[in-house]
Amino acid sequence: MAWGKLLNAGQTCIAPDYLLVQEEVKEEFLSLLAKEFDHLLGKNPQEQKHFVRIVSDRAFARLSGYLQYGTIYYGGKMDAKERFFSPTLLTDVDAASPVMQEEIFGPIFPVIPFSELSEAAEFVTKREKPLALYYFGVDG
């Protein structure tokens, strides 16, 4: 998941736009995903020359605006001059907010908790069909 979101700083059509995570493992999952981001990019990803920058000032401004729609669990560091945007995990995101209604096309990862698998399936099927959907779980 981390690699898929970080590839080209999330600026690919098949980058995952959000994560549905079972409530009972959410905190552990977030901690492990943050560690994986650190493993892949180090503690200061801005220093990594292989972590690409955001494609344009307009795209950077759009991504920056998305941060208001959740709580930053990890990341959230930005540099407009370099168009650097760190990998960012957002929690407490409203499903009706723009960050959940539009293709993100950047390194922001909203995390949406669910209790039952049927709840997650309903969440996905009520939305526009994504170009790609990735499932990681015990049953698949």
What does each of the following model-derived ranges do?
Residues 84-140:
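Conserved C-terminal structural/oligomerization subdomain of aldehyde/semialdehyde dehydrogenase
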Residues 1-94, 113-118, 122-123:
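ALDH superfamily catalytic-core signature
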